[in-house]
Amino acid sequence: MKKSIVFIFCCLSMFLSFGQENNADIGSEKVLDSLYREDQFYVGVTYNLLLNRPEGISQSGFSGGLHVGFIRDMPINKKRNVAIGIGVGYSLNVYNHNLFIDKEEGTQNTIFNSLEDVDFSTNRFATHIVEAPFEFRWRTSVPETHKFYRIYTGFKLGYLFSFNSNFKDPESRIKQTTINELDRLRMGITFTFGWNTFNFHFYYSLTPLFTDEALLGQETVGLRPAKVGLTFYIL
């Protein structure tokens, strides 16, 4: 009888001890889960394209972009692998092409011409944009590892706060920074997917770079940027 009582007491002690450990683990998981976020800082590099080009306009050389920012990750499910992201960032973009941009002498009117048959060494423009990305985020992440699949889709709103064009040929160099025909309000859709460190990123602008007042002959200049590249996330 005594042996039976001792055996039952030992079993109960082990059971209670196991239950306390499980409760402690569950409690720690809840605390960790309530704080878990992912992919809040980003750095991206892209190859830049100009779509919807007027006749006679083409890109030449390499056109690239650098993008950095912070996105606040706001999970919307218990596993915290589905989230909404809202943030702020900066985007630098350089485009090499044969669209000549200058000012009509004595006026503020902008001249747009094709350099299709002109010998030049440099012709490009750069844009500096402050952006607000909005994303719907899905991932296979857990707090213990940074290696997981992700699919993020959304859009970016932006403001083009600085523009400069640079033309150089053997005889002259022309720079322009004030272009009235710029469409400074930017909006585009985004799609990012990948695993671990390497994530492919796509961007397509819903608004042209130039307003309808920018003309090349009788055709609007337009130009819709598209970007293809890699995005790297931190924290």
Residue ranges and their predicted role:
Residues Q20-D73, T231-L235:
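Short glycine/proline- and aromatic-enriched beta-strand/turn motifs that initiate or cap beta-hairpins
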Residues G27-D39, P75-V82, S141-Y149:
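Short loop/turn motifs that connect adjacent beta-strands in outer-membrane beta-barrel proteins
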Residues R37-D39, S60-L66, V82, A126-A132, ...:
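Residues that define the transmembrane beta-barrel architecture of outer-membrane proteins
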Residues N48-L50, G89-Y95, K156-S162, S205-L209, ...:
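Structural signature of outer-membrane beta-barrel domains
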Residues L49-L50, S58-L115:
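Glycine- and aromatic-enriched membrane insertion/assembly motifs of diderm outer-membrane
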Residues P54-G61, N96-E105, I111-T127, L160-G188:
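Extracellular/periplasm-exposed beta-strand and loop segments of Gram-negative cell-envelope proteins
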Residues V68-M74, V88-Y90, A132-W138, T153-Y159, ...:
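Residues on the lipid-exposed face of transmembrane beta-strands in outer-membrane beta-barrel proteins
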Residues T177-L235:
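Predominantly the C-terminal beta-signal and adjacent terminal strand-loop region
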